[in-house]
C-alpha cells in the first residue's frame, strides 16, 4: 500500500483512540513504509475485537504524490464511514448533474451497496436538500424474477431506500417482470425491453456519448469474490461484447438464478463516475487482485476492466493492498494521500 500526504504534518500528531488501542500516530514526516516488512516503521496489525479486527499504526512516513493514471483509492476507518462517504458522494453527484441539466442518472448494483445509501433518507439540510423528483434510477444488472422476489435487485433497493423517499415511481427504471411467467427464456425478452426503454429516454435525462452510448452520472458497483461486476462473469463471452446493445441477456449465470440482464462493459465504462466499495475482510484479497495483479483486458477479472474507477475501503477491505496508492480519511487526523512503500535497508 502506498500513501502520501496532502498537507504538512507536525512532528507529532495526536492519536485518535478507539477504546484503549492507539489507531493513528505520526512522529516524523520522513521514513519508510511496507505493509509486509517486519522492519517497517508502519505496520498493519490485526487485533481481535468484538466489533472490528484491524487497526493501523503509522510512524515515520515519506510523502509521495499519487502517480498519474493511478485509481482514486480512499481508506476509511470503519464500514459506517464508508457508507457515509458513499451517501455523500451520491448526493454530491446528484446536485452537480441537476445543476448542469436538470436530472440525475444513477446506476445501482444489488447487495450491500444499497444499504450504504440509507443515510440519504436522513438528509434534512434545506440548503442542499435532495431533489428526488429529478433522480432517475437504473439497475446495472437484474435477476429475471418478480420485482417482489427476495432475489430482485430492484426489490431490495425499493424496500431499503426508495419506498421511504419522495421519488416518482416512474423514475425507478425496473425491468418489466410481466414479460415472463417462468425464469426460463426471460433474459432475452427482458434485456431487449430494458434496452429499448433506456434508449427512448431524452438526452436531458440520460445523455449520450461516443457511439451513442449512455452517460450515467454515477454507477455504484459491487464486485464478487470471483471479480465479476454487474452480471458480467469471468471469461464469459458477454464480457467482451461491443455492439449497439446497452443491455445484454445472460441465460447461463454461474450464480443462481441463471437468467439475468446486465449492462455491457462499454456502457459501464462510459459512465461519468464509477465507484466501488470494498468493505470487510472478504473483499480484501480480490480487491488487491483487481488493482494490482489482474489482467485489465482479457476478461478473466471483469472488475479490472472498469476504467477510471474510484475505490472506497474500510481498513480491513484495504488490508491486502501492497502497491496501490491510497488516501486515508480518518476522523481526528490530517488527511493523508499515501505513503512510500520502500523497506529499510
Question: Where do the protein language model's features map onto the residues?
Answer:
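Class I SAM-dependent methyltransferase SAM-binding "motif I" and its flanking Rossmann-like core
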Residues: 219-266
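Glycine-rich N-terminal segment of FAD-binding domains in flavoprotein oxidoreductases
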Residues: 98-127
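Glycine-rich beta-strand-to-loop/alpha-helix junction loops that act as flexible
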Residues: 108-113, 221-225, 279
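Ligand-binding beta-strand-loop-alpha-helix segment within the catalytic cores
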Residues: 60-70, 129-217, 331-340, 344
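N-terminal glycine-/serine-/threonine-rich phosphate-binding loop
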Residues: 57-106, 188
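N-terminal chloroplast transit peptides
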Residues: 1-41
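N-terminal organelle-targeting presequences
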Residues: 28-65, 72, 345
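ATP/nucleoside-binding phosphotransfer catalytic cores, i.e., glycine-rich phosphate-binding loops
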Residues: 266, 270-345
